[in-house]
Structure formats: C-alpha cells, structure tokens
Curated annotation (Swiss-Prot):
It is an enzyme of class 1 (oxidoreductase). GO terms for molecular function: identical protein binding; iron ion binding; sulfonate dioxygenase activity; taurine dioxygenase activity. Belongs to the TfdA dioxygenase family. This is Alpha-ketoglutarate-dependent taurine dioxygenase. It comes from the Bacteria. Keywords: Dioxygenase, Iron, Metal-binding, Oxidoreductase. The keyword Iron applies. It comes from Pseudomonas putida (strain ATCC 47054 / DSM 6125 / CFBP 8728 / NCIMB 11950 / KT2440). Fe cation binds at residues 97, 99, 253. Its EC number is 1.14.11.17. GO terms for cellular component: cytoplasm. GO terms for biological process: sulfur compound catabolic process. 2-oxoglutarate binds at residues 124, 253, 264, 268.
Length: 277
C-alpha cells in the first residue's frame, strides 16, 4: 500500500495521496483512511475523477448512505446529491453548519466531489469541534457538558426559499412533517475516539433547552463564534476532481458564496451515523 497522509494544519485536515478511489479500495486502504479521518477529521484527495456510482461505492465502505429529502440527486444514483448553483438555491451552505443535524442520527461523514468550478472563489472551510471544545475554560466545559440543544430543519431550509413551486412545497412539507425539531447534546462524545466536541451549529441549532431564551441566544452567539475561530479551521481551495471526506460528528463547514454569477457543481454522498451522546 502506497497511501501517504500529509497533515495540513494543527487543528484538522490532511491530504491523502497514493490511492485511487474510482476502484474498489482494499480493506487495508479503507482502514488506513478511517484512521486518518479519526485523527485529522477532514481528508482531501486531488485528481480523483470519479463518477457518481464510484463515489457512492467509496462512501458506502464507511456506512449506509443517506438520501437527502430536499436537494436533487443523481437520477441513477440517488445516494449522491447534486449541489448545482444553476438549478438549486444553495445559500444555506454559506453558513457554518454540520450536515443534517435535524435527524435523530446525523451523518457520520460525507464525501464531496468537485465537478465544475468557477475560475476562482468557491472555497470551503471546515472547523474542528474537538479543538473548539478543548480550548474552552474548564468551568464552561463542565457546564456545557450537561446541556442539550434544539436542531430544526427549517432554520436552513425556510419555506420561502424551498417551497416556491407546488412540487417543492409538497416536498418541504413532507420533510418538515417527517423531521420535527429535536434535541442533541451540546457536547458530543465521538463514538470511536471518545473525544468530546462542541455539537451546535448556526445552520440548524435554534436554542439551548435548559436556559432561558435570553441566556440561550447569548450563549449560542458565543459558541458559534468560538467554534469557527481561525485556529480551529482549515480552508480548501478546490480544483476539479478534488474529493473531501469529513467526519461530520465533530466538524462543521462553510461553503464560501463569492463566485456568483459563475457556476459551481458539487456531488455529495452522505454516510449515516448514530445518535449523539
């Protein structure tokens, strides 16, 4: 096995080379990638011209795949969703968020492939919830560890943007009905590494349940700002056929919306996870 892992920043991020994910990777390669993901939280691979079927196959080596209730998907490969700025409003990605935390079992991770890019712009940033939690003072860590927060699908997918046609409205209403607001711990324990991470995000978290509305709003503002500090984050400048694979259990990300009216097309396969604790 010739797989090479190059760390990119102290908090998170590593580049992997020496593996071709268009083919069915070996068990040894799969285990090495999983260990790298646990350590570095987000992995980047250059020059991976994969098709949707290959992308889904690679992602499925790490768990069952999720079909997104709102975003369009590849017709013959529904496990791969399409983020195409020419056809879909993707402004919700231009906010710090952890994918699908409105689910009882949010995603374990996601595999994102760059298909069409603007000449410049359209970078993505990731931030480590582990680094953010560990940098807090001990009294604040202790307080947060016993709190829960509400996550709401409609915060990132409001009706006025995602219910503009009868078909979209029906899809939005069904998604809201099937995904009512729910609670997750403010501090999540990684089910494999045991490390603790902040698990609130601006995209879906609406309030801290045990606090008053005033206290909740103030604390969430603090946590949202703290969790995305530069020293806890990494910024990736995409090239076509790049692939990113991140641990959604302990990270959040932000897609920079600075390239309009140019087009950006990305494919994402999302891996189902387990209930946060």
């Amino acid at each position: 096995m010739s797989l090479t892992i190059t760390p990119l920043s102290p908090a998170l991020g590593a580049q992997i080379s020496g593996v071709d994910i268009s083919r069915d990777i070996s068990a040894e390669e799969r285990d090495a990638i999983e260990q790298a993901l646990l350590q570095h939280q987000v992995l980047f691979l250059r020059d991976q011209p994969i098709n949707p079927e290959q992308q889904a196959r690679f992602a499925a080596r790490f768990g069952d795949l999720h079909i997104h209730p709102i975003y369009p998907n590849v017709p013959d490969t529904p496990q791969v969703l399409v983020l195409d700025t020419a056809v879909t409003d993707v402004r919700d990605n231009a906010v710090w968020h952890t994918d699908v935390t409105f689910l009882p079992t949010p995603a374990l991770g996601a595999v994102l492939s760059a298909k069409q890019l603007p000449a410049y712009g359209g970078d993505t940033l990731w931030a480590s919830g582990i680094a953010a939690f560990e940098a807090l003072s001990a009294p604040l860590r202790e307080m947060l560890d016993g709190l829960t927060a509400t996550h709401d699908f409609t915060k990132s997918f409001p009706l006025e943007r995602f219910g503009t046609t009868p078909q979209d409205l029906a899809r939005w209403e069904a998604t809201r009905r099937n995904n009512p607001p729910l609670s997750h711990p403010v501090v999540r324990t990684h089910p494999v590494s045991g490390r603790k991470a902040l698990f609130v995000n601006e995209g879906f978290t609406t309030r801290i349940n045990e606090l008053s509305e005033l206290e909740s709003d103030a604390l969430l503002r603090l946590l949202f700002a703290h969790a995305t500090r530069p020293e806890f984050s990494i910024r990736w400048r995409w090239q076509e056929n790049d692939v990113a694979f991140w641990d959604n259990r302990v990270t959040q990300h932000f897609a920079v919306d600075d390239y309009r009216p140019n087009r950006r097309v990305m494919h994402r396969a999302t891996i189902l996870g387990d209930a946060p604790f």
